[in-house]
C-alpha cells in the first residue's frame, strides 16, 4: 500500500495529531453511522478490507463531519450550503488543542478553561468550526468574524440551534481584518484564523485539479466538485502571505487588546 493510500483509506492511529485530539484513531464507522444513518450510503470496503469513505465526495465529507460533531462534541445540528468550505474536523481540532497549549504557557502550564477565556476567529466561514470545537472542548467564549453575509447567516443558525452563544460579526469592509470587529473595550486571549491560501481563483482551481489527480489518480474532469469553498474562503489578492502580512500590520493597533 502506498503512503497516499494509507492516509486516505486506513485512518490508523494518527501519531502526528495532538494527544488530546479525539480523532487519533481510525474512524469507527459503525458508531458514526448510528449517529448519521445516511453516512452509511457512502461507506464501502476497499481492496485492503478496510471500511472507508470517498473523501472526494463533498456530500460524503459533510455527512462525516455531521456525524463526528454529533458523536464527539454533542453538536446535533450542523449543516452548510453546497459549495462552501467543509473543513476536516481532525485537523481543525488539532489547531485548537495546540492553541490551548499556547495559552497554558501564560498560565503556569495549566490550560485555562471557561467563558472567561475570550477568543476571536477571523473568517469563521459558514462552518464555524473553530468556535464549535473551542467551546465544546474548553468552554471558551467566542467572537467570530466573516465578510460573507450568507456564511454569517448559516453560522448563526448553527450557534443558535446548538445553544453555543457564539458572537458572530459581519466585517462590512473587506480591506480590514480587526478594524470594525474588535470593540474599543474588548480584550481577547487568543486569535485564530484559517486564512485564504491562494492568490487567485486560477490558483485555487489549479490546486483543486492537482489534488484530484495526485490523490485519486483520476483525470480532473472526472471529479470537479470535490473541494468546496467560496472565493473568500479559498483565495485573496496576494494569497496567504499577503493576508498574514496585513493581519500583522493591523494587529499593531490592537497590541494591548489581544494576548495571542
Label each region the model flagged.
Residues 1-86:
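N-terminal auxiliary segments of SAM/dcSAM-dependent transferases
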Residues 60, 87-94, 236-243:
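Phosphate/oxyanion-binding active-site loops and adjacent basic polyanion-contact surfaces
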Residues 68-72, 90-118:
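Conserved alpha-helix/loop element of class I SAM-dependent methyltransferases that forms part
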Residues 112-126, 142-143:
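Conserved class I S-adenosyl-L-methionine
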Residues 126-140:
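Conserved SAM-binding loop of SAM-dependent methyltransferases across substrates and taxa
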Residues 139-147:
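Glycine-rich phosphate/diphosphate-binding loop of Rossmann-like nucleotide-binding domains
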Residues 147-149, 161, 165-260:
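S-adenosylmethionine
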Residues 155-156:
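Conserved SAM-binding loop
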